[in-house]
């Protein structure tokens, strides 16, 4: 056996083992943006001695996804995904008592006798029916609690009811809790709520462990076909890690957790449900199911929930999922009287237009550039990542997570840097990084250098973090996809930009973004800043409203049913609109 030291961990492996397999088997979270294909060059590692691994090199370093172990070695993961990411906002969800979805109910039953030998379940079922509630077949968790639950208080049953459905027996004297979960492609956001008060008892955001199988949903779908159990477990274990930490922190027992609501894009939810999402990746792009799904927690492997149900929100289409439904619910777009646009930018961009009581939605495959993937020095928002950049005439200043030296650049910083480079004449409107003699500032000219035949612009003094011409092109492709989707949706609904009264920027990415920078690169048209608001993770808040309230659940189902999906594929004007959108300006006619 070989001895392999990875950062601070000592592991064993066999000669000929792939380093990527060792990382996965050891539960070490590490990004493989292209899914292990060796094409993105972003999983480079330092190995000592260098001769202990075989495989292709990128900038003189082995790729973790291609490296094969041959001898004892030490491996240093230069950019390792942080296990925990701080969540931006917390807070309660105000729910009227009459609108509360989960409530306590007490039923007094007639005790059994030699003359009345009905089973425990028959006895409870008939009492539920008499109270106007449903009495479906009980699951194993409810049956396990049945005998003690009925006899502990002399046949007075203390129950928890969700609408007209029985969730289980109430933990007497204790609050009952539930989880709202946003299962994202990149991150998983989990919040714990008191179901009676709407109080948020805690929140955690983690990187989705599926990042080891690729940065985008197409990579995940392909990986699911190769190893469906591992890919599904990567998602469920990420959720469980966050949920268990929240329960421990809030000192809440698993028996008190009775309800969980999950939102996510269609491929993420298909995978969580154990359904093959492959048909979502091929025309005509038909999901297996768009309805809400309700299952016992055991079917998801959710050991952090003792009883009750796990529910997913409905989908709108193969490309607009339950996360978008959550955004609609959270922002009240279904009842919006103003003409409003909601935009969730990420690897997959979703756009919703509310106008005249009608909802229309579309999506754009922006790719992973907004998340820092496929960028030379790109990364997620992890320790050492540059999040904000200001390009001044004589200097470049950077804000770094953790406060140390910058080691990488995340999507928000990429947009801000390119916007600043445009303002200072380092990039022209076509996206070309200009020659040094075309830049007016001597300090900025000195930041231009050639790397592998392409011009690059240094963000750090030592040139260790930089933006290349290829990186600028990647950003252009990503923002053009979003912009074209916005324009197409507005054209389809006959809406001019001047009619848009409110723009909502949703998602963790939108929360950290400079709106003026988005306008400068042409992602949004010139817009008064007071018309734009960043709403954070609205999908998670929508999940919380469905978790806690009858009206939230009803609105989610109504929104999914009434929202019209606008398909962009095959439109004759799409390619020309996309080409125009590559420019770093919005142009006329909006």
Model-identified regions with their sequence ranges:
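Local cysteine-cluster metal-coordination motifs and their immediate loop/turn environment
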Residues: 29-50, 56-71
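A short acidic Gly-Thr/Ser loop motif
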Residues: 36-38, 181-187, 193-196, 265, ...
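Nucleotide/phosphate-binding catalytic cleft detector across ATP-hydrolyzing
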Residues: 59-180, 185, 231-236, 240-254, ...
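Glycine-rich phosphate-binding loop of actin/hexokinase-like ATP-binding domains
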Residues: 184-185, 190-216, 278-292, 326-329, ...
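N-terminal phosphate-binding loop and adjacent alpha-helix
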Residues: 209-248, 374, 385-390, 474-477, ...
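A short helix-loop
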Residues: 352-355, 380-443, 556-568
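Catalytic phosphate/nucleotide-handling subdomain of diverse soluble enzymes
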Residues: 355, 491, 495-560
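A contiguous, well-structured pocket-lining segment that forms one wall/lid of small-molecule binding clefts
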Residues: 422-493
């Amino acid at each position: 056996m070989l001895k392999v030291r990875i950062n601070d961990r000592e592991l064993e492996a066999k000669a000929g083992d792939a380093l990527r397999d060792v990382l996965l088997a050891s539960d070490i979270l590490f990004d493989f943006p292209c899914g292990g294909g060796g094409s993105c060059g972003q999983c480079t590692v330092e190995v000592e001695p260098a001769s202990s691994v075989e495989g292709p090199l990128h900038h003189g370093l082995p790729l973790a996804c291609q490296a094969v172990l041959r001898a004892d070695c030490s491996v240093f993961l230069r950019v390792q995904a942080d296990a925990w990411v701080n969540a931006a906002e917390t807070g309660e969800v105000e729910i009227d008592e009459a609108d509360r979805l989960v409530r306590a109910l007490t039923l007094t039953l007639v005790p059994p006798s030699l003359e009345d030998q009905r089973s425990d379940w028959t006895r409870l079922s008939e009492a539920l029916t008499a109270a106007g509630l449903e009495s479906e077949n009980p699951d194993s968790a409810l049956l396990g609690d049945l005998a003690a639950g009925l006899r502990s208080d002399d046949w007075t049953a203390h129950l928890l009811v969700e609408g007209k459905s029985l969730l289980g027996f109430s933990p007497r004297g204790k609050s009952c809790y539930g989880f709202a979960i946003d299962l994202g492609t990149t991150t998983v956001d989990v919040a714990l709520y008191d179901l009676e008060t709407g109080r948020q008892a805690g929140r955690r955001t983690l990187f989705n462990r599926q990042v080891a199988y690729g940065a985008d949903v197409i990579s995940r779908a392909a990986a699911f076909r190769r190893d469906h159990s591992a890919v599904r477990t990567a998602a469920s274990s990420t959720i469980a890690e966050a949920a268990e930490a929240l329960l421990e922190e809030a000192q809440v027992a698993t028996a008190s957790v009775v309800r969980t609501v999950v939102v996510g894009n269609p491929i993420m939810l298909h995978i969580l449900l154990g359904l093959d999402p492959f048909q979502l990746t091929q025309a005509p792009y038909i999901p297996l199911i768009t309805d809400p799904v309700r299952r016992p927690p055991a079917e998801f492997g959710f050991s952090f929930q003792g009883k009750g149900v796990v529910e997913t929100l409905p989908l709108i289409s193969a490309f607009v999922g339950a996360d978008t439904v959550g955004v609609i619910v959270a922002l009240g777009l279904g009842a919006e009287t103003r003409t409003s646009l909601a935009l969730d930018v990420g690897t997959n961009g979703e756009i919703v237009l509310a106008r005249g009581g009608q909802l229309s939605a579309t999506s754009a495959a922006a790719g992973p550039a907004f998340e820092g993937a496929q960028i030379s020095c790109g990364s997620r928002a992890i320790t050492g990542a540059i999040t904000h950049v200001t390009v001044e005439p004589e200097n470049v200043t950077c804000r770094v997570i953790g406060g140390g030296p910058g080691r990488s650049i995340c999507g928000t910083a990429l947009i801000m840097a390119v916007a600043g480079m445009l303002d200072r004449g380092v990039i022209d409107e076509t996206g070309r990084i200009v020659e040094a003699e075309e830049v007016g500032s001597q300090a900025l000219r000195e930041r231009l250098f050639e790397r592998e035949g392409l011009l690059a612009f240094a963000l750090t003094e030592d040139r260790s973090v930089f933006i290349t011409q290829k990186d600028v092109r990647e950003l252009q492709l990503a923002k053009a996809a979003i912009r074209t989707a916005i324009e197409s949706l507005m054209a389809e609904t006959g809406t001019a930009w001047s009619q848009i009264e409110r723009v909502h920027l949703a998602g963790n990415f939108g929360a950290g973004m400079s709106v003026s920078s988005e306008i400068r690169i042409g992602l949004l048209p010139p817009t008064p800043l007071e018309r734009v608001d960043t709403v954070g993770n609205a999908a998670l808040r929508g999940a919380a409203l469905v978790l806690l309230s009858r009206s939230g659940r009803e609105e989610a189902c109504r929104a999914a049913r009434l929202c019209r999906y606008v398909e962009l594929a095959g439109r004759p004007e799409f390619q020309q609109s996309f080409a125009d959108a590559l420019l770093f300006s919005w142009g006329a006619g909006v």
